[in-house]
Amino acid sequence: MNKVVIAGGTGFIGMSLAQHLSERGFHPVIIGRNKPKDLTKYEFIQWDAVNPGDWVHALENAHAIINLTGKTVDCIKTPENCDLILRSRVESTRNIGKALKEVSNPPKVWVQMSTAHIFGDPPTILCTESSSTGYGLAPFVGKAWEEALLQSLPSGIREVRLRTSFVMGKNGGALVKLKR
């Protein structure tokens, strides 16, 4: 069985990804804090995102772990929300790293959500992997998130950083709000 574990998979990206993977013969396992009422199609395991627990067994013999966890950035940037945006990403990433060290047959690849805004918003510069990071909340969070990945990554597991920007789709993401 080609099991793929999606941490933080109850949002727009996670559910779209689960459907895509399922259509291609993979078995998505969604890990999240709260099970959506309409989530009946995929296996769901509850976690608190900061402590290893019963969910760790899902990583055993999985093909991949995909970490999409984190408080939505679509909120008013109060000090409390900014802190939650940072901590929800960094703590969950560290937690996954701890859990991967507990299983006998961990996934071969860890796909880690990040942000294209790690470089800031340079208006005329084409950014590459060697570009300087920017300043502000998004670059700060992006750097901390990726550093947590690098510090938590067990040897032998390939890492992929998925640096997204605005996510849009017919039924979710930023497009729904932009249509209003």
Where are these regions (language model features)?
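Rossmann-fold NAD(P)-dependent oxidoreductase module
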Residues: 16, 20, 99, 148
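Conserved Rossmann-fold NAD(P)-dependent oxidoreductase catalytic core, especially the SDR/UDP-sugar
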Residues: 94-136
